[in-house]
Design a protein with these regions (language model features):
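Short amphipathic alpha-helical segments enriched in leucine
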Residues: 37, 54-58
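Short amphipathic alpha-helical segments
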Residues: 44-54
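Solenoid-like repeat scaffolds
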Residues: 39-41
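Charged, low-complexity intrinsically disordered terminal regions and linker tails
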Residues: 1-35, 51, 63-137
Length: 137
């Protein structure tokens, strides 16, 4: 099973990421996290939106956003273990040049920011009809 292989690959010690490491984003994206989670309650947690945004970016074929990320979203340990493992595995598979957990998390954050940009554009263009479940189809 290809999916099982990706999960196994993501769990290798080589891709170990300390659970107390901070997941970061840009100030503009942090405001959008706050909007969707704290104000609109579209997502229950920022870490749920984080992994969702990674998947949105990967599915859209978006390039990683390398802007400086200086605001915390959450700790790695807060993120659902299975969702995080899938995101790690997919990003590691797409970026074979990455060979350590620190660089992998940096790239995951870059993909999350790309996904947030896609979601923000959709949100701004859809007024009150924003439905992130459309990305699951």
């Amino acid at each position: 099973c290809k999916q099982g292989g990706i999960l196994k690959m993501a769990e290798q010690e080589f891709f170990s990421i300390n659970p107390s490491t901070h997941i970061r984003t840009t100030s503009e994206n942090r405001r959008f996290y706050d909007l969707l989670v704290d104000e609109k309650n579209i997502f229950s947690t920022k870490y749920q939106l984080y992994t969702f945004a990674i998947m949105v970016a990967l599915r859209a074929g978006a390039a990683p956003d390398s802007a400086t990320k200086n605001l915390d979203i959450c700790l790695v340990g807060n993120v659902d273990k299975d969702n995080f493992a899938v995101a790690k595995g997919l990003v590691a598979h797409l970026c074979p040049e990455i060979n350590n957990g620190s660089d992998l998390l940096k790239r995951m954050n870059e993909y999350a920011d790309s996904g947030i940009a896609i979601l923000r554009t959709d949100y701004e263009n859809s007024d009150e009809d924003f439905d992130p479940s459309a990305y699951l189809e």
